[in-house]
Regions:
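Glycan-recognition and catalytic cores of secretory/periplasmic carbohydrate-active enzymes
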Residues: 2-233
C-alpha cells in the first residue's frame, strides 16, 4: 500500500519481509533467525541450560516485537488489515507462549508445549503495554483483561528488597533491572489511563521514583542496567 509517509512504507515493507523470511510453515510462529539454524543459541536468556536447547521457533522476546510492530502500523495507518493480522496471526502465535502451569499466569520465554522455560518480567511488561494499546485502539475488552492479568504477574515480581522494584527474571531473582522497572512504570500508567483505577497510578509513580533513585546515574542521568541484591550496580 502506497503511503505518503516514507517511514510507514518502510515499516510495512519490513513487516512483510519478516513474515516472508521468518514464518514457520503451517503455524503462526516465527523462526529465531534467518537462514533458519536450530543450533543457534540465544544470548539473552537467564538459563544456560535453556540456551543450549535446540528450538524450532523464536523465543518470546523477538516474537513479541511483531505485536508492537502491528500495533504501531494499526495506529499510524488505521488500516483494518493490521487489525486482522493482529487477530489472525500475531495473537494466536503469542498464545503459544502463554503459561498456565505456573501461577500467576504469564508468558514464558518459549512455547508452553515444550518443557518449562524462564519467565521474564520485562518481556511481560512490554506485552502488557501492547495489550493496553490494543485495547485503546480497538475497545476490545479482552485485551484490557489480558493486560490486567499480566500486571498481576508483574506485581508478583515486586517486593521490599532494595526498597521496592521489580526483578528481571522470575526464576533468577538476583537483580532488579531498568528494563523491567522503567517500562513497568509506563505499563502501570497506561493501565491507569485505560481504567482510571488509582491503584495503577500509585504503582506507576512508585516504580518511576524507585527507578530514578536506584538506577539513574546522577552524573550523566543515564540509567544503569541493573542493581544486584547486594546493591552492586
Amino acid at each position: 500500500i502506497a503511503n505518503a509517509n516514507p517511514n510507514i512504507e518502510k515499516a510495512q515493507q519490513t513487516l512483510d519481509a519478516l513474515y516472508q523470511n521468518y514464518a514457520a510453515t503451517n503455524t503462526c510462529l516465527l523462526r529465531e533467525n534467518y537462514p533458519f539454524d536450530q543450533d543457534n543459541k540465544a544470548t539473552y536468556l537467564a538459563s544456560e541450560e535453556q540456551a543450549k536447547r535446540r528450538n524450532e521457533y523464536s523465543y518470546l522476546w523477538p516474537y513479541s516485537g511483531t505485536f508492537s510492530a502491528v500495533n504501531a502500523l494499526l495506529e499510524s495507518t488505521e488500516n483494518k488489515k493490521y487489525k486482522k493480522l493482529l487477530e489472525n496471526k500475531v495473537l494466536p502465535g503469542l498464545e503459544e507462549y502463554f503459561d498456565t502451569r505456573r501461577k500467576p499466569f504469564a508468558y514464558s520465554s518459549y512455547i508452553s508445549s515444550q518443557p518449562l522455560s524462564d519467565r521474564f518480567y520485562d518481556d511481560n511488561v512490554w506485552l502488557g503495554i501492547d495489550f493496553t494499546d490494543s485495547y485503546r485502539m480497538t475497545g476490545k475488552q479482552a485485551y484490557l483483561e489480558k493486560a490486567k492479568l499480566i500486571w498481576k504477574f508483574i506485581l508478583s515480581g515486586k517486593d521490599d528488597v532494595l526498597g521496592g522494584g521489580i526483578y528481571w527474571c522470575e526464576q533468577k531473582k538476583e537483580s532488579k533491572n531498568t528494563c523491567s522497572n522503567a517500562p513497568g512504570a509506563v505499563f502501570a500508567l497506561k493501565l491507569f489511563q485505560a481504567t482510571q483505577d488509582d491503584a495503577y497510578l500509585k504503582e506507576g509513580k512508585e516504580l518511576y521514583e524507585w527507578t530514578k533513585k536506584n538506577l539513574e546515574d546522577s552524573k550523566d542521568h543515564l540509567y544503569f542496567d541493573n542493581i544486584s541484591l547486594n546493591k552492586k550496580i
